[in-house]
Curated annotation (Swiss-Prot):
Bias-annotated ranges (Polar residues): 162-171, 259-281, 293-310, 419-431, 464-488
Stated family: Belongs to the wetA family.
General function of this protein: BrlA, abaA and wetA are pivotal regulators of conidiophore development and conidium maturation. They act individually and together to regulate their own expression and that of numerous other sporulation-specific genes. Responsible for activating a set of genes whose products make up the final two conidial wall layers or direct their assembly and, through this activity, is responsible for acquisition of spore dormancy.
UniProt name for this protein: Developmental regulatory protein wetA
Domain commentary: Has an acidic N-terminus (AA 1-52) followed by a Ser-, Thr-, Pro-rich domain (AA 125-233) and a basic C-terminus (AA 461-555).
Induction (free text): Expression is induced during conidiation, after conidia had begun to form. Positively regulated by abaA. Negatively regulated by velC.
Effect of a null allele: Prevents the formation of normal conidiophores.
Record keyword Transcription present: yes
Organism of derivation: Emericella nidulans (strain FGSC A4 / ATCC 38163 / CBS 112.46 / NRRL 194 / M139)
Region (Disordered): 113-171, 250-310, 419-488, 508-531
Gene designation per UniProt: wetA
Length: 555
């Protein structure tokens, strides 16, 4: 047909390869090719190393085929090799089968893998018939167990002596062409089956790691085919992740962190330059001390640190650290500028810088909880600000870093003046004359609060003290309410747990109850008994019974 020029070179190469294969593969040794074939295929071993690379039916049918199917495949394949040794009877009668098989295999390979399986026509035109033969046979040398291995050797030795007819050779040629045509599809099946069975098999027996070893040693065209097969299946969702994760694209994953490390180093340099020019306070060193990351401040140590670790999730934390710093840094800078102007208005600017540093450090460490603030010292110093202005400035700084100035001052001052004025009323006249020396609105408000709160609390305490004392006519709602009910409980106002009240408490009533409840219960019991007896007497009297006998029983 149209491919006559390829026939002779194809037949010569194929016959040389089959002769070498039948003489050398009996003892499971590596195939050594002649020089012309070595120039086309620079491979060292097909039977042992490339056995795992075979695209064919062996690994696809591991789970489903019994041992008899292994024998059938082996019979057809060993007829390939055995029949081709007889070169006298080996002749193509119409000389169309290898060329058409070659063209059909190229077309079907292109259809099977899309536009990406271009590795077969990229090499010389005689390469496809030679590659699948040893790959098919080598795939049978590496099953999971040694039993298939020995059966394959024995059956090849027996079947090599059988028929050498050209008809069988032609059918085996067509079978070799069909095996070559099924090459990319079988590769996809092998990859999927490997990912399915990877939990059951050990890694040295599985196909793809041995493929990586053969790629790294001496194979030139097979990585191109593998890469094209991987590109052909990019449409599916799970297969690119499986291919990229382990065993095909492992070499470009190693130098990948270097550009990201350089970009991070550039980001760190930009961030350090921005923070060095913008921030006026020493807040960024304290923040770095809090976060304990000294290597992030050094831009030269960034690429070496990332290249040693080679862990991609570790790269995501240092930008977050810098983002946290940039998120926190505007707030102390604005507050520092605002309080710088505030301190220049009130006091001398000499203690301004250490006060801001201490306030910044406290703000970063405590998260705005105002733990360092002492309310008693703050109230005493603010009540006479003419003598100690810098301490009031410090306390105002600590207040205004987290909340607005006026509302918490009123709250804190009210509570502190309550605690000072109530337990020790003798201090209030000593504080108030000093506060009159400086007419400020804050001190005036505090004095007003102290004047309102100070007489109120001792009055309530006097009321509570009078309640424990002897009864007086001012206090009498409790005693007046109990006095008309029971005659016994008139003098008792409240149960005090003393030695004198022991008999009152422990007379059938719970110790926590008062004598009022005891008297009320006794009165209710007496009334109930009286009503019951009266009703019984009336019923007996209506019935015409003996009323006197019933009264004697009831009384």
């Amino acid at each position: 047909m149209f491919a006559h020029p390829f026939d002779h070179s194809f037949n010569d190469l194929f016959n040389q390869y089959v002769n070498m294969d039948t003489s050398s593969t009996d003892a499971n040794k590596d195939v050594s090719f002649p020089s012309e074939f070595d120039q086309l295929f620079p491979l060292d071993s097909f039977s042992t190393d490339c056995g795992d690379q075979s695209p064919v039916i062996s690994t696809v049918q591991h789970n489903s085929q019994p041992a008899q199917d292994w024998g059938k495949d082996l019979w057809s394949l060993s007829q390939n090799t055995g029949c081709s040794t007889n070169q006298d009877s080996f002749s193509f009668q119409d000389s169309t089968q290898p060329s058409t098989a070659l063209d059909l295999s190229i077309g079907l390979e292109a259809d099977a893998t899309g536009h990406s399986q271009a590795s077969v026509p990229r090499s010389t035109p005689s390469t496809p018939p030679a590659t699948p033969g040893p790959k098919v046979k080598g795939g049978l040398f590496t099953p999971k167990t040694i039993r298939h291995h020995r059966e394959s050797n024995d059956r090849r030795g027996l079947l090599r002596k059988q028929s050498f007819s050209p008809g069988l050779m032609r059918s085996s040629q067509l079978q070799k062409g069909s095996c070559r045509m099924a090459y990319p599809e079988a590769w996809a099946q092998r990859l999927q089956n490997f990912t399915i069975r990877s939990s059951d098999e050990c890694l040295p027996l599985s196909p793809p790691p041995s493929d990586i070893l053969v790629q790294q040693e001496n194979v030139k065209h097979t990585p191109v085919q593998m890469r094209n097969a991987a590109e052909g299946f990019q449409g599916s969702t799970e297969l690119p992740q499986q291919i990229d994760s382990g065993y095909i694209t492992q070499s470009p994953a190693i130098p990948m962190p270097s550009p990201s490390a350089n970009a991070l180093a550039g980001q760190q340099q930009r961030y350090l330059s921005q923070t060095g020019t913008s921030a006026l306070t020493p807040s960024p060193p304290s923040a770095r001390d809090v976060f304990s990351s000294p290597h992030s401040s050094d831009p030269q140590s960034m690429p070496s640190w990332h290249s040693e670790s080679l862990n991609t999730p570790a790269f995501q934390y240092t930008p977050e650290l810098s983002d946290h710093q940039t998120w926190w840094s505007p707030m102390p800078s604005e507050v520092a500028q605002r309080h710088a102007s505030y301190q220049q208005m009130i006091a001398s600017p000499a203690p301004q810088r250490p006060v801001q540093a201490a306030a910044n450090h406290g703000d970063f460490l405590q998260g705005g909880l105002m733990i360092q603030l002492d309310p008693t010292q703050f109230d005493i110093s603010s009540s006479f600000p003419s003598s100690t202005i810098p301490t009031t400035a410090n306390n105002h700084d600590n207040l205004a870093y987290n909340v607005e100035a006026h509302a918490p001052q009123k709250y804190v001052d009210a509570s502190s003046f309550n605690t000072q004025a109530v337990p020790h009323p003798s201090r209030s006249p000593s504080i108030s004359p000093k506060a009159d020396t400086s007419p400020r609105h804050g001190s005036a408000n505090r004095d007003g609060m102290a004047m309102k709160n100070a007489p109120r609390r001792p009055h309530g305490r006097k009321l509570s003290g009078q309640s424990t004392s002897t009864p007086k006519p001012v206090k009498t709602p409790n005693s007046l309410s109990t006095s008309p009910r029971g005659g016994k409980s008139v003098t008792v106002s409240f149960v005090n747990f003393t030695a004198n009240d022991r008999q009152k408490i422990l007379t059938g009533v719970a110790p926590s109850g008062s004598s009022k409840t005891k008297a009320r219960r006794e009165q209710e019991a007496r009334d109930r008994r009286r009503k019951l007896s009266e009703a019984a007497l009336q019923a007996v009297r209506k019935a015409g019974g003996d009323v006197e006998a019933l009264e004697a029983v009831l009384c």
